[in-house]
Regions:
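Core catalytic region of metal-dependent phosphoesterases/phosphodiesterases
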Residues: 2, 15-113, 176-178
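Short, hydrophobic/glycine-enriched beta-strand segments
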Residues: 2-8
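Short glycine-rich loop/turn motifs that provide flexible caps or phosphate-binding loops at active sites
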Residues: 6, 48, 78, 119-122
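Conserved catalytic scaffold of divalent metal-dependent phosphoesterases
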Residues: 9-16, 86-175
Length: 178
């Protein structure tokens, strides 16, 4: 069993938001082909953000169907473009009602895979300095803490923790040098 990660799929099977304008020609088929070559049913695939361009959860079915039909268990985390994201309960209910069985979410919670705890959150741009950015960063830090604590409480403190984030946790501005 292996763990894979891929983010920023920006799927748009139900909406007209083609990614070929960014040079992503035929990218859905390329994702599918590579996924089928590498991932098997017992593997875990982490999708830390920007999964779908949809604005509402009820419009995401075709995007979820695409990954549901690929092998492996999928765990999604929120990205900055996942405007369809809702409460954990609503998202899980949607998956259940649509019979999408091998997908789940990390959102103030955790997941156990083999001997690992999977935790995470979206994160935020740590270099941004506005008041709203500060609030978002503080909230995301709390979500990360909740996710890690949840994993330790549910699965034990002796297991290694894999943390997923949509925004990399950079601690300094590399554009300034040094």
């Amino acid at each position: 069993m292996s763990i894979y990660a891929i983010s920023d799929l920006h799927l748009s099977f139900n909406t007209n938001k083609p990614m070929d304008i960014f040079g992503w020609e035929n990218y859905e088929e390329r994702i599918k082909t590579n996924w089928l070559e590498k991932v098997n049913e017992k593997d875990l695939v982490l999708l830390p953000g920007d999964f779908s361009w949809e604005m509402k959860l009820e419009n995401t079915y075709k995007d979820f169907e695409f990954i549901n039909n690929l092998p492996g268990k999928k765990l999604l985390l929120k990205g900055n473009h996942d405007l369809w994201w809702s409460t954990l309960k609503k998202m899980r209910t949607f998956l259940e009602e649509e019979n999408l069985k091998n997908i789940d979410f990390i959102y103030n919670n955790s997941y156990e895979f083999e001997s690992y705890i999977i935790a995470g959150t979206r994160g935020w741009n740590l270099i941004a300095e506005g008041e709203e950015d500060k609030k978002i960063k503080e909230r995301e830090l709390l979500r990360l803490e909740n996710s890690i604590k949840n994993g330790i409480e549910k699965y034990g403190k002796d297991k290694p923790i894999i943390v997923c984030m949509h925004y990399p946790p950079l601690l300094k501005d590399f554009n300034k040098g040094g």
